[in-house]
Amino acid sequence: MKKKEIVDDVTMKRAITRITYEIIERNKSLDNLVLAGIKTRGVYLARRIQERLKQLEGIELPIGELDIKPFRDDMKVEEDTTDMPFDINGKDVILVDDVLYTGRTIRAAIDNLVSLGRPARVGLAVLVDRGHRELPIRADYVGKNIPTSSIEEIVVEVIEVDGKDCVSIVDPS
């Protein structure tokens, strides 16, 4: 198994800043905007976007945490640890995740989101888009496009969970 770091902590910070600027530019008003991080690493990325928005615009967006496990089509988990401490009805929700691959995680996140209410609009921000979609889903905000083969894996590490910030490609062969 070969592991190669392709994004270091500085580059990751820049990618998150780029996503944050794109969110500012593409949304006429941030007043109706909320962030929903997809557990686990998407939550930490959403918090970083929230912090950058606070630094750049002086606004603190509400942030929630989506647990997609109970909504997956490939596993059966009953417990839902979603924490959405605000009403999403009529809100512009930006889902935040670490990697966009087949689209199945995002489908499950949308299923969870609409079970909580009816947002006005749903967008998607991802740190890495690696391609290989199985569902018609695309990200509105992308930190890095990293094409991979179908056997390779993208591993995102965040300091809050893993002790460092980086993105690596793992080749299992």
Curated annotation (Swiss-Prot):
Q: Which SUPFAM superfamilies match?
A: PRTase-like (SSF53271)
The record's catalysed reaction(s) read: UMP + diphosphate = 5-phospho-alpha-D-ribose 1-diphosphate + uracil
Motif stretch (PRPP-binding): 93-105
Q: Which UniProt keywords apply?
A: Glycosyltransferase, RNA-binding, Transcription, Transcription regulation, Transcription termination, Transferase
Determine the domain of life of the protein's source. Answer: Bacteria
Gene Ontology terms: biological process: DNA-templated transcription termination
UniProt-listed Pfam families = Pribosyltran (PF00156)
What EC numbers are recorded for this enzyme? 2.4.2.9
* GO terms for MF: RNA binding; uracil phosphoribosyltransferase activity
According to the UniProt record, what class of enzyme is this? Answer: transferase
Function according to Swiss-Prot or TrEMBL: Regulates transcriptional attenuation of the pyrimidine nucleotide (pyr) operon by binding in a uridine-dependent manner to specific sites on pyr mRNA. This disrupts an antiterminator hairpin in the RNA and favors formation of a downstream transcription terminator, leading to a reduced expression of downstream genes. Also displays a weak uracil phosphoribosyltransferase activity which is not physiologically significant.
The entry assigns this protein to a family as follows: Belongs to the purine/pyrimidine phosphoribosyltransferase family. PyrR subfamily.
Q: How does it assemble?
A: Homodimer and homohexamer; in equilibrium.
Give the protein's recorded name: Bifunctional protein PyrR
Starting at the broadest rank, the lineage of the source organism is: Bacteria, Bacillati, Bacillota, Bacilli, Lactobacillales
* Gene name linked to the record: pyrR
